[in-house]
Amino acid sequence: KLSAAFILLLTVYPAVCLVGGRKWKETGVYLGLGVVTALPFFIRNVLISGWLVYPFTQIDLFDVAWKIPKGMADYDAREIQVWGRGYTDVLQYDLPMSRWLSGWFQTLAGSDKLFVVLAAVSVAALLVYGAGMVFGWWERRWTLLLVQGTVAASFVFWLCTSPLMRYGCVWVYLSPAVVFGGILEAVLYPAGGLQAAW
């Protein structure tokens, strides 16, 4: 799912360490493994639809006979987004978030509402926590912040695009756990202790 795209941010830290340490062989191995891992996904997309990342038509590399027409692929992309927002009419695709968010939220189950609110609060808390690291108000744990930021960015991306719970429930549940868990760990173990793991 495209809602998992931000997980690629987790590769930033190891990449910086490898390149900074001039470990070119290891860098090549990991890049190769990444390509080998992603290749079946892309091949499958092309064989089924003619598009590298269906239904997104911004990357148009192949001209094959079975290619789904661009207009139909664009329609599918919009239909997926409005469906996630609780609508069935594709003409409502351009509605601003301020118009559809409250209606979407009302349709959620009680526990899902609670977790969405907790996830939103965790994003706000992470902004304050991250600013505190940047300005040196508390200990800098950049690796932890990268993990927290990746999860929070994935939640925000899911929420702003196509927030059907089954597409992004992992980000809804993980955001409060990872953000608040990391902050709690930093408070309980400001020096030493569990911080060695980060």
Q: Model segments located where?
A:
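Perimembrane helix-loop-helix junctions
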Residues: I7-V35, V178, L184-A186
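Hydrophobic, aromatic-rich transmembrane alpha-helices
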Residues: V16, L95-R140
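Membrane-interface helix-boundary motifs at transmembrane edges
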Residues: C17-K25, V134-W142, L188-Q195
